[in-house]
Amino acid sequence: ELNQIIASQDLEIVVAAMVGIAGLKPVFQAIKHGKHILLANKESYVVAGEILNNLSKKTGATIFPIDSEHSAIHQCLMGVKNEESISRLILTGSGGPFLNRDINDFKNITPKEATAHPIWNMGDKISVDSSTMMNKCLEIIEAKWLFGFDDIDVLIHPEGIIHSLIEFKDKSLIAQLSIPDMKIPIAYGLGFP
């Protein structure tokens, strides 16, 4: 059973990459057992971020995001000495497959078009969420709980090279840039620290 595997003393890292709310119970169990969690299941933090954060403080579990945007924010924060100097977090999004489509033509959108993400190769649910920008809404909520910031904005960046930025009160920025390849944030998470 999954709970027994998660509780095992031999298990150090849990990769939580299941889709939807189904990820909440395994993420909760991994935190309960003090594991190092590579998190790609945003829904668990959207619905229970405060609870999961409080539990991780008690158990010593670490939550490391492996979504490209959240991994990028994590990397940017590593270079920040004073978080009070931060003005806002900026997540990027491609704008989805309909960014330049005439709004009057939206009624003709097909399911096949809605699942054809211009940058990332993803499953149908997250592709549809991305095509409607709903995925970005979920990522904003997740970022709030992962990083403790309320001022979070979105920048449409169709090329997918800039993954996230941090803006400081003096209006300077730091960003994480890379080719759009999920192997990069996953490898970073596996190798951190």
Q: Which residues make up each language-model segment?
A:
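Catalytic, metal-anchored helix/loop core of enzyme active sites in primary metabolism
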Residues: 1-193
